[in-house]
Amino acid sequence: MNYKPFDGTISICDKVALITGAASGIGKATALAFAKSGAKLVLIDMNPAVEDYAKELAEQFSVETLPIVCDLTLSATGKMIVDKTDEKFGRIDILASVAGIGLVDYAVNLTEEMWDKTMLVNAKAPFLLCQAVGRYMIKQGGGKIVAVASQGGVIATDRHVAYTASKAALIGMIKTLALEWGQYNINANLVSPTVVLTEMVERIWQGEDAVLMKKKIPSGRFCYPDEIAAAILFLSSDAANMINGENLLVDGGYTVQ
């Protein structure tokens, strides 16, 4: 990896950043944090609402944005995203792979369809995009990849067998990319949150389940999307140049027990 003396700032100003899942939740919060930091944004989501959000950020923060509405589970999507980004910006500095799903049920009830969809969205799709971006970054001379996994990929949680398996696969995949691509000045890291208060998660963690889960977290609360965005921004910056293959747990201490 190339060495750059730390200048006292954590900045991604003028960096070209791809963010998946950018229309909602952690991805949306990450796009906001990156826009505030002056990054050039490629906002990716299946939801067409990402187009309006890209326009909003561009107007509010005077940053260049490129919205891409697509299905990340299709094998050709990664190259399409890379080609469109290269055409507009001429480089890719950061990939924040945030998009994911949480289909939960006890193992005895989980359907094959639920298992396959979870693995497709949470493990295979991130790999396909990382592969396409990685090929580009190798030729370019480096870059930063940050994927959002979960504390569930580190420690088991009941009703989450498919989710846990998919996030554990994602963690293993990113660590392997760090091993293979570090020689090309590419950093590949993960952020693994505890329960994050997004619309998707709030549908899962309700009532007594939420109360009991909070009691297991030493910090006593769930996480907010902007707290995860802050961790992603740090790992995307030059301040994290010597961090590679790390799984940064933003879990309020849940996994130390």
What are these regions (language model features)?
Residues 37-53:
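Conserved glycine-rich Rossmann-like NAD(P)H-binding loop of the short-chain dehydrogenase/reductase
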Residues 106-107, 111-116, 201, 213:
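Substrate-binding pocket helix/loop in short-chain dehydrogenase/reductase
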Residues 130, 166, 174:
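Active-site helix of classical SDR
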